[in-house]
From Swiss-Prot:
<dbReference type="GO" id="GO:0019843">
    <property type="term" value="F:rRNA binding"/>
</dbReference>
<dbReference type="GO" id="GO:0006412">
    <property type="term" value="P:translation"/>
</dbReference>
<dbReference type="GO" id="GO:0022627">
    <property type="term" value="C:cytosolic small ribosomal subunit"/>
</dbReference>
<keyword id="KW-0689">Ribosomal protein</keyword>
<dbReference type="InterPro" id="IPR004044">
    <property type="entry name" value="KH_dom_type_2"/>
</dbReference>
<dbReference type="InterPro" id="IPR036419">
    <property type="entry name" value="Ribosomal_S3_C_sf"/>
</dbReference>
<comment type="function">
    <text>Binds the lower part of the 30S subunit head. Binds mRNA in the 70S ribosome, positioning it for translation.</text>
</comment>
<dbReference type="InterPro" id="IPR005704">
    <property type="entry name" value="Ribosomal_uS3_bac-typ"/>
</dbReference>
<dbReference type="InterPro" id="IPR004087">
    <property type="entry name" value="KH_dom"/>
</dbReference>
<dbReference type="InterPro" id="IPR001351">
    <property type="entry name" value="Ribosomal_uS3_C"/>
</dbReference>
<keyword id="KW-0694">RNA-binding</keyword>
<dbReference type="InterPro" id="IPR018280">
    <property type="entry name" value="Ribosomal_uS3_CS"/>
</dbReference>
<protein>
    <recommendedName>
        <fullName>Small ribosomal subunit protein uS3</fullName>
    </recommendedName>
</protein>
<dbReference type="Pfam" id="PF00189">
    <property type="entry name" value="Ribosomal_S3_C"/>
</dbReference>
<feature type="domain" description="KH type-2">
    <location>
        <begin position="38"/>
        <end position="106"/>
    </location>
</feature>
<dbReference type="InterPro" id="IPR015946">
    <property type="entry name" value="KH_dom-like_a/b"/>
</dbReference>
<comment type="similarity">
    <text>Belongs to the universal ribosomal protein uS3 family.</text>
</comment>
């Protein structure tokens, strides 16, 4: 039976870049754990801001966060109030100096993480899983995705036995290294249990072999 490698890790250094960019000899395990906690804290604080990616860079004891979001206004706030509050909360919790950069996502419909979270939200609101998948897939295709695949796993529609259902439209060449594949995962917490949602989006081929910045 064929197994799926993570499409992001598979392309690291080829046409994808690391989301944690730093080097350390002695403090490596501590930094990895701290990165995990920083992402968890930011995601929880900005759960309503449509965060797709949280990149972390470290240099000289300072931490630089690069947030990719569909709603930069919510992250920054009026006159930068919200972003200053977030910086203060991070400094207080992790005892480090933080700088935060915000990048706006122009087309959230083709960002796999946001698409997965959108489907999970629909499932929590009791929308039928097939309708949620088909609606989202057609929307992504309309906004320029060359291919998209969605899987939902769990007690779908309240069934006694958990199963996996999937829906695909267009090409999603997971084994082609030059293919720009975006991957996202989210969980829907329903009354019947947790439903896992995975999304793969094919955005075209990167022919010049450049690593994304």
């Amino acid at each position: 039976m064929g197994q799926k490698v993570h499409p992001y890790g598979f392309r690291l250094g080829y046409n994808k870049n690391w989301q944690s960019r730093w080097f350390s000899k002695k403090e490596y395990p501590g930094f990895v754990f701290e990165d995990h906690n920083i992402r968890k804290f930011v995601k929880k604080t900005l759960y309503h801001a449509g965060l797709s990616k949280i990149e972390i860079e470290r240099a000289g004891g300072k931490v630089r966060l690069i947030l990719s979001t569909a709603r930069p206004g919510i992250v920054i706030g009026r006159k930068g109030v919200e972003i200053e509050k977030l910086r203060g909360d991070l400094r207080k919790k992790f005892k480090r100096e933080f700088s935060i950069e915000v990048n706006e996502i122009r087309r959230p419909e083709v960002e796999a993480q946001l698409v997965a979270e959108n489907i999970a939200l629909q499932l929590e609101r009791r929308v039928a899983f097939r309708r949620a998948m088909k609606r989202t897939v057609s929307m992504s295709r309309k906004f320029g995705a060359e291919g998209i695949k969605v899987t939902c796993s769990g007690r779908l529609a309240g069934a006694e036995i958990a199963r996996t259902e999937w829906y695909r439209d267009g090409r999603v060449p997971l084994q082609t290294l030059r293919a720009d594949i975006d991957f996202g995962f989210a969980e829907a917490r329903t009354t019947y249990g947790v439903i896992g949602v995975k999304v793969w989006i094919f955005k075209g081929e990167i022919l010049d072999n450049e690593v994304e910045q």
